[in-house]
Amino acid sequence: MGRVRTKTVKKSSRQVIEKYYSRMTLDFHTNKKILEEVAIIPSKRLRNKIAGFSTHLMKRIQKGPVRGISLKLQEEERERRMDFVPDESAIKTDEIKVDKETLEMLASLGMSDTPGISAVEPQQAMAPIAAFGGGRAPRRY
């Protein structure tokens, strides 16, 4: 079973990653040396825990955005995705295929002359598959 990480370890490693993301790597020993240089951590054991969690978070960041860590790269990527406008609309309304009943409903509403609506024969539903048991007699308990 894994160990529980304290709030101190989690908060401090998130802060270190936000400030020194460009220097952090996926290697524990490198991250430990970076922490030694950039932060004043009272004990070796706490430094190792923070370095370990920072390494863990760096691996998660490689896979995708991580909650609680705001990186400039991720913010720019999110902005780019939000501002994206597709060349062609995903909702094409050039032609709408409807069945006879729907056409009648549109006619009753006075919308039968709407452009792009065409009638299509409804597809037949498949016959239901035999019930459980494959046609055998019911179980006797």
Curated annotation (Swiss-Prot):
Gene Ontology terms for molecular function: mRNA binding; structural constituent of ribosome
Keywords: Ribonucleoprotein, Ribosomal protein
GO biological process: translation
InterPro entries hit by this protein: Ribosomal_eS17, Ribosomal_eS17_CS, Ribosomal_eS17_sf
GO terms under cellular component: plasma membrane; ribonucleoprotein complex; ribosome
Superkingdom of origin organism: Eukaryota
Family statement drawn from the similarity comment of this UniProt entry: Belongs to the eukaryotic ribosomal protein eS17 family.
Protein name per the record: Small ribosomal subunit protein eS17w
Organism of origin: Arabidopsis thaliana
Gene giving rise to this polypeptide: RPS17D
